[in-house]
Amino acid sequence: MNFSGLFPIGTVVLLKDSTKRLMITGVCQFSVGEDGNQKFYDYVGVVFPEGYLSADENYLFNADQIEKVFCIGYQDSESLAFKEKADAAVEEIRAKSEG
C-alpha cells in the first residue's frame, strides 16, 4: 500500500503482535503518564467491529505499530485539508521531541 502521512478516521488496521483489528477514531493524541510526562501518539482507536465500548477501551498507538491496513477511512476535501495540517503538526512534534 502506498499511503503517506496519517491515515484518516475510519481506517481499520491490525497492529503488530495483535489479533484484534482497530478502527482509527482520532489522530495526534497525547497521554499523560504516571510520571506526569506527556507522550505523543499518532492515533487513538477502538476495537473493530464492536466500536466504542467505554473510555477505558480506547487504544493509543503509532504508525510504526501498524502491521496491516484493511480499509482506508473516508476522505473528502475537508478531511484532506485537515490531514495536511495534522501531518505538519506530527512532523513538528516529532522534531521537538528528537531535538
List PLM regions with ranges.
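Intrinsically disordered, low-complexity, charged/polar segments
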Residues: 42-99
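Short, well-ordered loop/turn sites that connect or cap secondary structure elements
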Residues: 4-7
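Short beta-strand-centered aromatic/proline hotspots
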Residues: 20-30
